[in-house]
Amino acid sequence: MVAIAILAAGKGTRMKSGLPKVLHSLGGRSLLGWVLNSAAEVEPERQIVIVGYRSEMVRESLQAVPGLEFVEQAEQLGTGHAVQQVIPLLQGYEDSLLVLNGDVPLLRPQTLKLLLDTHRRHNNAATLLTAHVPDPKGYGRVICDGNNILKQIIEDRDCTPAQKQNHRVNAGIYCFRWPDLAEVLPKLQANNNQQEYYLTDVVNDLSPVMAVDVEDYEEILGINDRKQLALAYQILQNRIKDQAMAAGVTLIDPDSITIDDTVKLEVDVVIEPQTHLRGHTTIGTGSRIGPGSLIENSQIGANVTISYSVVSDSVIQAGTRVGPYAHLRGHVEVGSQCRIGNFVELKNTKLGDRTNAAHLAYLGDTTTGTGVNIGAGTITANYDGVKKHRTQIGDRTKTGSNSVLVAPLILGNDVTVAAGSTITENVPDDCLAVARSRQVVKPGWRLKQPDPT
């Protein structure tokens, strides 16, 4: 069994934001969301989040995560002080405690498993994660014997010139035998210039303590400012895109493409340049997305083509073509083998299979049957200034160019709407609807010209 404590109380002053640092977004999740996602892989018995700055906002952001416990750190007096807050919650607990930081989002689940397995296998009082970094400036140096048993953690400012050449650093991620930690935590002193309680002081008082190296030092990157956030995003994108290409996805220009971790791509998907896939999006096999497209929180079927378009909160079935310059938003459902062309906007609309809206149309709050053809310039006038109304269009119905369908409205099956018509009344099956002024032609008519003299 293992319990996990996640330090998430800090304000993050260097972020220069009203948002708690751990709630800043990174590739589809918050920083804290990434930590929780990795933590879940070790199947913890308990997960305790230590909150402080804007704690209610942090709690609210995690409402969908089951089984979390929260404890308040009213004053942020260091990492040791933060872990002291969990003592009342773990009375009688006899197993391991993983201590994680809510602003270290790149830590892989397998690294946590390695840390926990090493801790248990050697029956350590504590096991800490270490990394060999190219530039160790600012990190505490870890001194071990030949068996990776900790001898000392030395803060950067206290290192001798020789010790500064040591590139093995403390990642600030620990696994403790909880009864041992609970015994020494209350004795922790703030004997430093910052008057803070450091968890490293506790580690130096426990025995035996072992260090285990992370395979990739980038995993321990902490986020303290916007530049580090951007760096973490680049690292994360490289991970995601490498995994996608290894799984049979073609990325034409990886450097210009962004993909959230929550996106699912099937084999033989092709992503063109300048395309961005966000949120809980799935792309079916054989689909081609882009160039220049944004897909967000949408489910795209197999063999769909989308170019230069924005699709959000929508479902598109197999074989449909979208774009260029289409906009689908607000719970759109498009059937299979449809055509959504240039400068077409769909909002809260459901289109049946084999329906075409090839160009210059707006359909809002609309439902169509199958085989419908929406002529160029057709719009549904769905808003009366107070509320939205729906338009229902039957199978095989056709609207002529420049038609206005004033909702609420029902067009039956096999209806034809004449070009230029404004339809305000329901139209039964098999009817032609014409609603426009009759053309008048006056022979010999021309405007009087001014006298040039």
Swiss-Prot record:
<comment type="pathway">
    <text>Nucleotide-sugar biosynthesis; UDP-N-acetyl-alpha-D-glucosamine biosynthesis; N-acetyl-alpha-D-glucosamine 1-phosphate from alpha-D-glucosamine 6-phosphate (route II): step 2/2.</text>
</comment>
<feature type="region of interest" description="Linker">
    <location>
        <begin position="227"/>
        <end position="247"/>
    </location>
</feature>
<feature type="active site" description="Proton acceptor">
    <location>
        <position position="359"/>
    </location>
</feature>
<dbReference type="GO" id="GO:0019134">
    <property type="term" value="F:glucosamine-1-phosphate N-acetyltransferase activity"/>
</dbReference>
<feature type="binding site">
    <location>
        <position position="155"/>
    </location>
    <ligand>
        <name>UDP-N-acetyl-alpha-D-glucosamine</name>
    </ligand>
</feature>
<feature type="binding site">
    <location>
        <position position="436"/>
    </location>
    <ligand>
        <name>acetyl-CoA</name>
    </ligand>
</feature>
<feature type="region of interest" description="Pyrophosphorylase">
    <location>
        <begin position="1"/>
        <end position="226"/>
    </location>
</feature>
<feature type="binding site">
    <location>
        <position position="376"/>
    </location>
    <ligand>
        <name>acetyl-CoA</name>
    </ligand>
</feature>
<dbReference type="GO" id="GO:0043886">
    <property type="term" value="F:structural constituent of carboxysome shell"/>
</dbReference>
<protein>
    <recommendedName>
        <fullName>Bifunctional protein GlmU</fullName>
        <ecNumber>2.7.7.23</ecNumber>
        <ecNumber>2.3.1.157</ecNumber>
    </recommendedName>
</protein>
<feature type="binding site">
    <location>
        <position position="419"/>
    </location>
    <ligand>
        <name>acetyl-CoA</name>
    </ligand>
</feature>
<dbReference type="GO" id="GO:0000287">
    <property type="term" value="F:magnesium ion binding"/>
</dbReference>
<feature type="binding site">
    <location>
        <position position="224"/>
    </location>
    <ligand>
        <name>Mg(2+)</name>
    </ligand>
</feature>
<keyword id="KW-0012">Acyltransferase</keyword>
<dbReference type="GO" id="GO:0008360">
    <property type="term" value="P:regulation of cell shape"/>
</dbReference>
<dbReference type="Pfam" id="PF12804">
    <property type="entry name" value="NTP_transf_3"/>
</dbReference>
<feature type="binding site">
    <location>
        <position position="73"/>
    </location>
    <ligand>
        <name>UDP-N-acetyl-alpha-D-glucosamine</name>
    </ligand>
</feature>
<feature type="binding site">
    <location>
        <position position="224"/>
    </location>
    <ligand>
        <name>UDP-N-acetyl-alpha-D-glucosamine</name>
    </ligand>
</feature>
<dbReference type="InterPro" id="IPR050065">
    <property type="entry name" value="GlmU-like"/>
</dbReference>
<comment type="pathway">
    <text>Nucleotide-sugar biosynthesis; UDP-N-acetyl-alpha-D-glucosamine biosynthesis; UDP-N-acetyl-alpha-D-glucosamine from N-acetyl-alpha-D-glucosamine 1-phosphate: step 1/1.</text>
</comment>
<dbReference type="Pfam" id="PF14602">
    <property type="entry name" value="Hexapep_2"/>
</dbReference>
<dbReference type="GO" id="GO:0071555">
    <property type="term" value="P:cell wall organization"/>
</dbReference>
<comment type="similarity">
    <text>In the C-terminal section; belongs to the transferase hexapeptide repeat family.</text>
</comment>
<feature type="binding site">
    <location>
        <begin position="78"/>
        <end position="79"/>
    </location>
    <ligand>
        <name>UDP-N-acetyl-alpha-D-glucosamine</name>
    </ligand>
</feature>
<feature type="binding site">
    <location>
        <position position="373"/>
    </location>
    <ligand>
        <name>UDP-N-acetyl-alpha-D-glucosamine</name>
    </ligand>
</feature>
<dbReference type="InterPro" id="IPR025877">
    <property type="entry name" value="MobA-like_NTP_Trfase"/>
</dbReference>
<dbReference type="InterPro" id="IPR029044">
    <property type="entry name" value="Nucleotide-diphossugar_trans"/>
</dbReference>
<feature type="binding site">
    <location>
        <position position="103"/>
    </location>
    <ligand>
        <name>Mg(2+)</name>
    </ligand>
</feature>
<keyword id="KW-0961">Cell wall biogenesis/degradation</keyword>
<feature type="binding site">
    <location>
        <position position="21"/>
    </location>
    <ligand>
        <name>UDP-N-acetyl-alpha-D-glucosamine</name>
    </ligand>
</feature>
<dbReference type="GO" id="GO:0005737">
    <property type="term" value="C:cytoplasm"/>
</dbReference>
<dbReference type="GO" id="GO:0009245">
    <property type="term" value="P:lipid A biosynthetic process"/>
</dbReference>
<dbReference type="GO" id="GO:0009252">
    <property type="term" value="P:peptidoglycan biosynthetic process"/>
</dbReference>
<feature type="binding site">
    <location>
        <position position="170"/>
    </location>
    <ligand>
        <name>UDP-N-acetyl-alpha-D-glucosamine</name>
    </ligand>
</feature>
<dbReference type="InterPro" id="IPR005882">
    <property type="entry name" value="Bifunctional_GlmU"/>
</dbReference>
<keyword id="KW-0963">Cytoplasm</keyword>
<keyword id="KW-0479">Metal-binding</keyword>
<feature type="binding site">
    <location>
        <position position="362"/>
    </location>
    <ligand>
        <name>UDP-N-acetyl-alpha-D-glucosamine</name>
    </ligand>
</feature>
<feature type="binding site">
    <location>
        <position position="329"/>
    </location>
    <ligand>
        <name>UDP-N-acetyl-alpha-D-glucosamine</name>
    </ligand>
</feature>
<dbReference type="InterPro" id="IPR011004">
    <property type="entry name" value="Trimer_LpxA-like_sf"/>
</dbReference>
<comment type="function">
    <text>Catalyzes the last two sequential reactions in the de novo biosynthetic pathway for UDP-N-acetylglucosamine (UDP-GlcNAc). The C-terminal domain catalyzes the transfer of acetyl group from acetyl coenzyme A to glucosamine-1-phosphate (GlcN-1-P) to produce N-acetylglucosamine-1-phosphate (GlcNAc-1-P), which is converted into UDP-GlcNAc by the transfer of uridine 5-monophosphate (from uridine 5-triphosphate), a reaction catalyzed by the N-terminal domain.</text>
</comment>
<dbReference type="GO" id="GO:0000902">
    <property type="term" value="P:cell morphogenesis"/>
</dbReference>
